[in-house]
């Protein structure tokens, strides 16, 4: 389920960039994305005859999760305006590193030697992806770079809170309904504050937005919650390796995006860092037996 979640998340550029290219504001696209998703998942909750009632404490936790999801999704889609979507997605994919660091800071979960090496590799890969060692023509501006990295940090915080908060037990459908519904309200308020139009002008925009809501939102979030609740936050983040791969392939084949040699190497290094994180528990146990 974690792999399915990551692969479907990787389709966000394919379904959002064509709408953005027609002049629709980022906040408007995301508002409709989450509105349609909330209606779909909410209908499932009703069919399952599951109560939507939650305690005030759980509601506040859900609101916090929604705020994190608001920033994560908005900052990522904002990054698409300043760099290839595949690069933006790989930078966002720094979130497994943030998960490991947050688990260490908040819960004193040890970072072993292999995990530390993976974190350093990830940082090196991000440096290459940003164009730090290349000419100014190919380098990614510092502010957009920080923007997308912060989207990854917000997403990592979302994963950790989802796993370790005192949120009352609930199905992934109910949780997703709340997060998507509250995110819709946040984006509606954001559009109102920024003066963005709330209108989608044509059928093409509606089709892309509906698919954006269904595939990388409904399917991806339900499988993400399912994975986090059953296997934990760190393994779920690590299995997200398929997300940047999907985005890079989609960007190259469907959107005509090009990568520099350094960025390609950087992507490979980040993925190696993730694989090292995946293998670190097994390798650590084997090394202890030697």
Please identify what each model-predicted range represents.
Residues 23-31, 54-59, 131-154, 192-211, ...:
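Juxtamembrane helix-entry segments on the extracytoplasmic side of multipass membrane proteins
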Residues 1-28, 32, 75, 137-164, ...:
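Glycine-/small-residue-enriched transmembrane alpha-helix faces in small-molecule transporters
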Residues 37-57, 124-139, 182-205, 249-253, ...:
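Membrane-interface helix-cap regions at the ends of transmembrane helices
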Residues 28-39, 69, 76-110, 115, ...:
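Specific alpha-helical transmembrane segments that line the substrate/conduction pathway
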Residues 6, 32, 88-94, 161-184, ...:
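Helix-helix packing/entry segments at the starts of transmembrane helices
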């Amino acid at each position: 389920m974690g792999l399915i979640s990551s692969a479907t998340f990787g389709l966000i550029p394919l379904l959002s960039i064509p709408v953005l290219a027609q002049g629709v504001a980022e906040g408007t696209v995301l508002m409709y994305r989450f509105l349609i998703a909330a209606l779909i998942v909410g209908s499932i909750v009703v069919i399952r005859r599951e109560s939507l009632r939650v305690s005030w404490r759980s509601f506040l936790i859900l609101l916090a999760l929604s705020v994190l999801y608001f920033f994560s999704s908005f900052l990522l889609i904002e990054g698409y305006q300043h760099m290839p979507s595949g690069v933006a997605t790989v930078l966002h994919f720094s979130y497994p590193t943030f998960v490991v660091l947050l688990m260490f800071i908040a819960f004193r979960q040890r970072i072993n030697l292999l995990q530390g090496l993976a974190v350093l590799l990830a940082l090196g890969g991000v440096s290459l992806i940003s164009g730090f060692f290349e000419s100014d023509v190919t380098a990614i501006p510092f502010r957009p770079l920080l923007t997308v990295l912060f989207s990854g940090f917000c997403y990592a915080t979302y994963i950790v809170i989802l796993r370790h908060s005192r949120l009352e037990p609930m199905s992934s459908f109910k949780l997703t309904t709340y997060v998507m519904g509250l995110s819709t309200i946040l984006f509606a308020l954001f559009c109102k504050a920024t003066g963005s139009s709330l209108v989608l002008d044509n059928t093409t925009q509606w089709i892309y937005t509906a698919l954006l809501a269904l595939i990388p939102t409904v399917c991806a979030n339900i499988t993400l919650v399912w994975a986090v609740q059953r296997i934990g936050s760190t393994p779920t983040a690590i299995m997200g390796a398929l997300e940047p791969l999907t985005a890079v392939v989609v960007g190259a084949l469907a959107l005509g995006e090009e990568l520099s040699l350094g960025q390609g190497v950087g992507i490979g290094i980040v993925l190696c860092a993730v694989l090292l994180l995946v293998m670190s528990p097994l390798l650590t146990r084997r090394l202890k037996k030697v």
